[in-house]
Amino acid sequence: MLTLIPVSLAQANEFVRQHHRHHKPVAGHKFSIGCAENGRLCAVAIVGRPVSRYLDDGFTLEVNRLCSDGTKNACSILYAAAARAARAMGYRKIITYTLDTESGASLRAAGWTNAGLAGGKAWTCLLY
């Protein structure tokens, strides 16, 4: 059974260091959330200020890293939890980016919508 658990930035960054395909750990965050399967950490979400200064309006957060060991449904659980937490904290919008080569199924399952291509055209911006 999958459950949400609190994780520190250090724990989340270590998981990213071990499991993320193309990104390194982050310098800071607003909060991080873990997903555990039978007590074993299987995925993390690191949520912080938007990387784009144009989107950093004080009411928007970004899922800066989401990383899983491949456990089924862990990513969608974390995307949904991150959106709920951001709303509960008073944020009006939460965004993330995904590579065009990724399906986005976990984001759609969590209720996120595609906002279109990002400036670099290899990434797609999604919002909740």
Task: Say what each PLM segment does.
Residues 6, 30, 48-127:
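Acyl-donor binding region in acyl/amide transferases
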Residues 1-27:
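Short amphipathic alpha-helix that is part of the acyltransferase structural core
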Residues 16, 29-45:
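Conserved beta-hairpin
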Residues 25-26, 35, 85-88:
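Short, conserved, surface-exposed binding loops centered on an aromatic residue
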